[in-house]
Curated annotation (Swiss-Prot):
Name of the protein this chain belongs to: ATP synthase subunit beta, chloroplastic
Membrane topology recorded in Swiss-Prot or TrEMBL: Peripheral membrane protein
Family (UniProt): Belongs to the ATPase alpha/beta chains family.
SMART domains: AAA
């Protein structure tokens, strides 16, 4: 081994298997687990390469195995590797607002370098138990089905569950639109292993709506961190931690209330499974990594509210093959305060948002938190829809005419409720042509109260489809006659 390696803490690449690198160091100079290593060299075409990787395993004989955060094409055995002596560290604070970063904390929005004042390592411990905040309050989203049946907790963790193409990203974009704009604090968005086009659409939408202020970036209310589908698995596995580190700084140092959006937490698990296989670990159930629960817990326990400030997290969760018992969504369930489950059956009927009112849950749905009126209204909706679900087999075989008068009334009201739970979204105006609607919780409860009081039994059910509050449904019914 050459003198250069003896004098500096440098190593050499001895093996490259896709994004996994084996690197040998001088005796006594082996880097710690999670240390960042950098490779700066020229490839065979003479192009400058800058690759960062993270130590994952110590193999013995002064050799470590690291996972790359960048593409490894062009790397060769024998190239020099420098140990930075610390974990990946990313910029934090006001300088991150209005900018798009990659997993390494480098800006990728072609708007110049960031004046880095402070950096923090992406691997940090969760807040101590005694520092946690346990106050209970809900926050309004302006989306009827969510506010009524599965209300979100301020400073809690919320999961949006759904298979492919049922509307998770549109729902998360609407929540950003409704909450982030009215929200006094800051938001951090982590794009984990999703489409580049969606990230670009979100960025453009935020600039148009004033959430990102291009002329004075420090007035912006959001920081974006992207690691798209085409990134190596190491980057997709760590990008959520990069974004979370930025969010934690706003909470702990600036003492702000932070909204933290992740789209999609399943891709974090998926990337972890890829890395686990590349590192040669024995897979567990359905091919997932054996460390699935540990990795998920390590991320989720850091997303919490302390006495200094809060992080309210909204996470989209892809459900493979619509199977909620799959280990990835099942592990995520354990950490959440509210679950919004999207249904393919409702999406097929054209009811958007396709939120399943019976599957979606919230720990906040308690009479002593919400008040009796809200709680009773939510339970009446669930009871009616559950009875309608039970009657569907009878209707399919014998028809509506065979039902009792009481059951026919339940079916009629349930169909109106199902349609009234749909709503036009601001972010979907370009697809639907209908202007978006924000419905306050009071208006939502009032609307369902009128349906159950029988005041609207004579209105056609299509009057309730894709409207905002109940007044709109009544005026739509008048125009249908």
């Amino acid at each position: 081994m050459s003198d250069s390696i003896e004098t500096k803490n440098m190593g050499r690449i001895v093996q490259i298997i896709g994004p996994v690198l084996d690197i040998v160091f001088a005796k006594g100079q082996v880097p710690n687990i999670y240390n960042a290593l950098t490779i700066r060299a020229k490839n065979s075409a003479g192009t400058e390469m800058a690759v960062t990787c993270e130590v994952q395993q110590l193999l013995g004989d002064n050799c470590v195995r690291a996972v790359s955060m960048n593409p490894t094409e062009g790397l060769m055995r024998g190239m020099e590797v420098v140990d930075t002596g610390k974990p990946l560290s990313v910029p934090v604070g006001k300088v991150t607002l209005g900018r798009i970063f990659n997993v390494l904390g480098e800006p990728v929005d072609n708007m110049g370098n960031v004046k880095v004042e402070e950096t923090l390592p992406i691997h940090r411990t969760a807040p101590a138990f005694v520092d946690l905040d346990t106050r209970l309050s809900i926050f309004e989203t302006g989306i009827k089905v969510v506010d009524l049946l599965a209300p979100y907790r301020r400073g809690g963790k919320i999961g949006l569950f759904g298979g492919a193409g049922v509307g998770k990203t549109v729902l998360i974009m609407e929540l950003i639109n409704n909450i982030a704009k009215a929200h006094g604090g800051v938001s951090v968005f982590a794009g984990v292993g999703e489409r580049t086009r969606e990230g670009n659409d979100l960025y453009t939408e935020m600039k148009e709506s004033g959430v990102i202020v291009e002329k004075n970036l420090s007035d912006s209310k959001v920081a974006l961190v992207y690691g798209q589908m085409n990134e190596p698995p190491g980057a997709r596995m760590r990008v959520a931690l990069t974004a979370l580190t930025m969010a934690e700084y706003f909470r702990d140092v600036n003492k702000q209330d932070v909204l933290f959006f992740i789209d999609n937490i399943f891709r974090f698990v998926q990337a972890g499974a890829e890395v686990s296989a590349l590192l040669g670990r024995m897979p567990s159930a359905v091919g997932y990594q054996p460390t699935l629960a540990t990795e998920m817990g390590g991320l989720q326990e850091r997303i919490t509210s302390t006495k200094d400030g809060s992080i309210t997290s909204i996470q989209a969760v892809y459900v493979p093959a619509d199977d909620l018992t799959d280990p990835a969504p099942a592990t995520t369930f354990a950490h959440l305060d509210a679950t919004t489950v999207l249904s393919r059956n409702l999406a097929a009927k054209g009811i958007y948002p396709a939120v399943d009112p019976l599957e979606s849950t919230s720990t906040m749905l308690q009479p002593w938190i919400l008040g009796e009126k809200h709680y009773d209204s939510a339970q009446s909706v669930k009871k009616t829809l559950q009875r309608y679900k039970e009657l569907q087999d009878i209707i399919a075989i014998l028809g509506l005419d065979e039902l009792s008068e009481e059951d026919r009334l339940i079916v009629a009201r349930a169909r109106k409720i199902e349609r009234f739970l749909s709503q036009p979204f601001f972010v979907a105006e370009v697809f639907t042509g209908s202007p978006g609607k924000y419905v306050s919780l009071a208006e939502t409860i009032e609307g369902f109260g009128k349906i159950f009081a029988g005041e609207l039994d004579d209105l056609p059910e299509q009057a309730f489809y894709l409207v905002g509050n109940i007044t709109e449904a009544i005026s739509k019914a008048a125009s249908l006659k």
